[in-house]
Amino acid sequence: MKAFRLDELEAERAANDGAYLQFLRERNMSVGLYALDAGTTDSQKPHAQDEVYFVVSGRAAITVGMETTQVARGSVVYVPAGVAHKFHHISEDLRVLVVFSPPES
């Protein structure tokens, strides 16, 4: 078993000065913590993997392809591989668990 605490993951991510911390990588999936502060820009490009976002905290909008929705704590969003997507109108610091399948390269 592997178990993680969000507060420890956030501290590690912040200490490494990055918006993204991959903390689990297995044969069929990887998981990371993505952080975007209020007012910042999400510069993601489409990925070759399917993704699931689980919003841990914060508020924003996300556009996936041509669809836009508001997200906040507890929101779950699926993004198919190869589809353009980004968070925007980030009104509260956003922390998101990201699951990639297959694992992100």
From Swiss-Prot:
Residue ranges occupied by any Cupin type-2 domain in the UniProt entry: 33-100
Family annotation (Gene3D superfamilies): Jelly Rolls
A Pfam match: Cupin_2
InterPro entries: Cupin_2 (IPR013096), PKS_Associated_Protein (IPR052044), RmlC-like_jellyroll (IPR014710), RmlC_Cupin_sf (IPR011051)
Domain of life of the source: Bacteria
PANTHER family per the UniProt record, alphabetical: 16.7 KDA PROTEIN IN WHIE LOCUS, CUPIN TYPE-1 DOMAIN-CONTAINING PROTEIN
The protein's name in its UniProt record: Uncharacterized protein SCO3923
Organism: Streptomyces coelicolor (strain ATCC BAA-471 / A3(2) / M145)
